Amino acid sequence: MLYTAVWAHRGASAYAPENTMAAFLLARRLGADAVELDVHLTADGEVVVCHDNDIKRCSNGEGLIEDKTLEELLSYDFGYSALFGERFKGE
């Protein structure tokens, strides 16, 4: 019997900000078998999830991930967006 796996691209990114825990958990609740995501290394060698190598599009910050420490990245909000407003603030 054939089985078709459902992959959630950046989580349930149509319903929650991409690559956030909210998007990943919602994808699972919606029945996704797996999540596709991208990872990058920070300036201090930590692994973070983000599609772009620049954080401007998906956060309230600017700059390249590779130039920022994890502590710096944690100071930005990756949950707010014009699409979702305040609903996922702080993700």
Where are these regions (language model features)?
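Conserved beta-strand positions in the central sheet of alpha/beta enzyme cores
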Residues: 7, 35-36, 49
